Amino acid sequence: SDEVTARYPFVFNSFNEAAKAFVAGTEAEPMKVYIAPYVYWIDNPDDPQVRVGKDGKEPFGLVVKCPYLHLVGLTKNPENVVLASSRGQTQGAVGNFTMFDFWGDGLSVKNLTMGNYCNVDLEFPLKIELGRKKRMSAITQAHVAYCHGDKIVAENVRFISRLNMNPLNGAKRILFYKCYMESTDDALTGTGVYLNCTLKFYGQKPFWRTDMGGAVFLNSDFYVCHDEDRQYFCKGVGPLTVVDCRFHV
C-alpha cells in the first residue's frame, strides 16, 4: 500500500517508480531489485491513449538504462511475480509495442514472469481478481523486451506473448536456464543458449533469424501447439544447435 511504502525510502508498490531509483551496478556489486508476488503493470492497460514511438522507434513501456541490474522475484514459482503489459501493433499502439527496453551488460532476471498479454489471457492464481482477459483475439506483434548488452542471464523466468514475443532480444550473449516460453513466429532470441527450457510453439517459425551468432538448445522440450503439418525453427538461414531435446505433439 502507499501507506507502507511511504515509511521506507527504497520500498515501492510500482515497478516503474522503483526504476527511477535504479543506479548503475557493477559485476561485483550489482543493482539488486527484489520483487514481491503481485501483478505489476509496466504500462497501464486501461489508459485509452494509443502509444506512439519516438524518433522513428517502436513505442516502449519502460526504458531501463542500468548495467548489472538483477531483478529477482521473491518466490520459487515465477507465476507469482508478473511484469505485464497489454499492447501491440494496431492494438493500443502504433508500431510493435515493446514492454521493456533494457540497456547495459550483466542483466539478470530470476523467478518471475515477463508477459505481453495483448493476445493472451493473464491468469494469476494467487489472486484471481488480478487476472485480465487479452486485449484482442487477433494476433499482432506484441513484444516483451529488447536488451542491449552482453552477459545476460534469465533463470526460472516465464516469457509470454504470441507474435514477435522477443524475450530479451538483442543481447550479445544470453543464457536461458529453466525458462518457459510461449510464442508464435519471429519470437525467440537468436543469440541465446536455452538450457533445460520448455517452449510452446503456437506458430511454425519461432525464430526470425539466428545469424548473429547462433542459438543453442540443450536438454529442452518443444511443444507444438498448432495444427500445421510441419514445424520449422527459422524463417531465415542461420546456425542452430539442438542437443538432447524432445518434441511433443
State the predicted function of each range.
Residues S1-V249:
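Sequence-level preference for short, compositionally simple segments enriched
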